[in-house]
């Protein structure tokens, strides 16, 4: 994390569109967008030129855009890249929210910059931003199946009730921190989220 991160202007929740994938671990980014809209109102509307549904979030004195790509996960850059380019968004002002198999259910970690860590959605966004890796990430833990051969069916399935509750609790806590992220107060958000057990 840098000492003075940019205020977030765009929150991108990653997932796969369609009822088949609703509630799956891979759609953890969508879970956050749903929680923010439930709390603060608004509705996502299709924007075909960006291959995404978009909404504006008003939170205190701050506002930002919410994006739910309507591409499949592996093509998330088709939504994020053109939007960031058109509005000239610095990568540091973009928060990408995604599932993280290397964290247990119930944990959330914030990170600024870095590689894709094998996550195909992040890989495609990095490619679409011209190999720019400086965008921010909120990594929502969904747990690991125990062996790499089981990762794809695991993330594309729905969690057991106890895991679902842990992930939902983490999403709610991340939603509590969004106003700080919009203000650029990463230290406060990290202190709260990274102290979760």
Curated annotation (Swiss-Prot):
GO process terms (BP): protein quality control for misfolded or incompletely synthesized proteins; rescue of stalled ribosome
Positions annotated as active site in the UniProt record: 26
Cell location: Cytoplasm
Keywords for the protein's UniProt record, in alphabetical order: Cytoplasm, Hydrolase, RNA-binding, tRNA-binding
Chief localization: cytoplasm
GO MF term (any one): peptidyl-tRNA hydrolase activity
Keyword Oxidoreductase in annotation: no
Catalytic activity: an N-acyl-L-alpha-aminoacyl-tRNA + H2O = an N-acyl-L-amino acid + a tRNA + H(+)
Domain of life: Bacteria
Enzyme class: hydrolase
UniProt site (Stabilizes the basic form of H active site to accept a proton): 99
Coiled-coil stretches noted in the UniProt entry, renumbered to this chain: none
Keyword flag Hydrolase: yes
Enzyme Commission number(s): 3.1.1.29
Binding annotation for tRNA: 21, 72, 74, 120
GO cellular component entries: cytoplasm
Functional summary from the UniProt entry: Hydrolyzes ribosome-free peptidyl-tRNAs (with 1 or more amino acids incorporated), which drop off the ribosome during protein synthesis, or as a result of ribosome stalling. Catalyzes the release of premature peptidyl moieties from peptidyl-tRNA molecules trapped in stalled 50S ribosomal subunits, and thus maintains levels of free tRNAs and 50S ribosomes.
Alphabetized HAMAP family for the sequence: Pept_tRNA_hydro_bact
Family per record: Belongs to the PTH family.
Description of how the protein assembles with itself and partners: Monomer.
UniProt name for this protein: Peptidyl-tRNA hydrolase
Species of provenance: Alkalilimnicola ehrlichii (strain ATCC BAA-1101 / DSM 17681 / MLHE-1)
């Amino acid at each position: 994390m840098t000492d003075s991160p940019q205020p977030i202007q765009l929150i991108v929740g990653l997932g796969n569109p369609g009822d088949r994938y609703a509630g799956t671990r891979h759609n953890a980014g969508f879970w956050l967008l749903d929680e923010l809209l439930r709390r603060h109102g608004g509705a996502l509307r299709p924007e075909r030129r960006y291959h995404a549904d978009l909404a504006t979030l008003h939170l205190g004195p701050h506002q930002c855009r919410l994006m739910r790509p309507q591409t499949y996960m592996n093509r998330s850059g088709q939504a994020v890249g053109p939007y960031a380019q058109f509005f000239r968004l610095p990568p540091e002002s973009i928060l990408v929210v995604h599932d993280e198999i290397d964290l247990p259910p119930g944990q959330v970690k914030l990170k600024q910059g870095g590689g894709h860590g094998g996550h195909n959605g992040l890989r495609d966004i990095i490619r679409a931003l011209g190999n720019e890796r400086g965008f921010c990430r909120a990594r929502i833990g969904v747990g690991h199946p125990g062996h790499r051969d089981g990762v794809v069916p695991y993330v594309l399935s729905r969690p057991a009730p106890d895991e679902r509750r842990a992930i939902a609790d983490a999403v709610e806590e991340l939603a509590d921190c969004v106003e700080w992220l919009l203000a650029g107060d990463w230290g406060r958000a990290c202190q709260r989220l990274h102290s979760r057990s």
